[in-house]
Amino acid sequence: EISACLVGSEMCIRDSPHSFYNAVMNTNYIDELNESQCAAVTYNDGPSLVIAGAGSGKTRVLTYKIAYLLEQENGYNPWNILALTFTNKAAREMKERIARQVGMERARYLWMGTFHSIFSRILRAEATFIGFTSQFTIYDTADSKSLLRSIIKEMGLDEKTYKPGVVQARISNAKNHLVTPTGYAANKEAYEGDMAAKMPAIRDIYTRYWDRCRQAGAMDFDDLLVYTYILFRDFPEVLARYRDQFRYVLVDEYQDTNYAQHSIVLQLTKENQRVCVVGDDAQSIYSFRGADIDNILYFTKIYPNTKVFKLEQNYRSTQTIVCAANSLIEKNERQIRKAVFSEKEKGEPIGVFQAYSDVEEGDIVANKIAELRREYRYGYADFAILYRTNAQSRISVSYTHLTLPTN
């Protein structure tokens, strides 16, 4: 259905007097790139891994690479390019940038979006293959928890032991590893983990949850990955169609991909080897959500002919900040080594305050803000405070105590 739609679109565009096929493309953007960025953008002879340090122009490289692919003689049609991101905002910004290079008429036909939005689009077109209709419902987190709560109650289980949020996380983890209820029930390690957590009924809850979702014609967010993988695995003719359509696949923030996402990318690209992934193993912080750093660390082993590009110039931070970050990252035992540098000024030294309690930590921050406001007449909006988790509420208590407004 999608292929037919896109072919129809192509015919309409070619017949249009305003066809982008007749447009004169602007190639000046290549001159804006440094040597490493340019090499990454212009290489398209096989799989490529772009290791992009913080502030190194990663988004520019991705967007310019897509523009470059589109404007080459005998190049790619927009609908032959699949670009996967982790947020709708990132996809929207990238498409806007590409449109400025090649025109909105051309950019609009790109397959660009989050993993979930793209796979949802594919699943709706191919729903009958996996026993759904194209109108299937997508459950959000609240819907999923509500259904799990009902199942837990129906099974007569203690909700204090089987907390819906905890159960949901365990099921989500299974799905992110492409483990269906049948596989979960047969998995000794999963069962032992559930027993250790005093939740031996997880396997039964998972089975009921899976069945109830199918009966309701619904998928949760994780199902969008699982069913896409199953679709491509069990119906090779469908996979072949999408392999033929997506002649080039690009993936942003590859260090944040989980096993399921990585596996689907592999399904689509292992044969034609036209894939470019961009990321930074040093920025991998989402393992608690299923991200698998091995996807980027071992990319060159999975795609042996990979060309590796390293974007090492940081355009955002001062030398002091870059050196401090490098001194910490170099201690990582497993990493793709790079020499990040900055040509900006040295900058202010980094101050470190060691507190002896969370209360004192909050007081130090609040008092420092008050001191700087008195000395330099700063406004509250001039300060940004970062903390690791929302559970660090003592800082907020200090703000309240000292009547410091927060936004």
Stretch-by-stretch model annotation:
Residues E1-D15, H401-N407:
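Single conserved hydrophobic/aromatic residue that forms the stacking wall/gate
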Residues H18-S134, I138, A240, D294, ...:
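P-loop NTPase Walker
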Residues D31-T42, G46-V50, V61, L82-A83, ...:
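Conserved helicase NTPase motor core
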Residues N44, A107-Y109, A127-D223, F246, ...:
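ATP-hydrolysis module of ASCE/P-loop NTPase motor domains
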Residues G46, N77-N80, A107-R108, E271-Q273, ...:
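Short glycine-/polar-rich loops that comprise or flank the Walker A/P-loop
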Residues V50, S56-L62, P304-K307, E312-Y399:
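Helicase P-loop NTPase motor core
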Residues A83, M112, V277, K310, ...:
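Conserved SAM-binding loop
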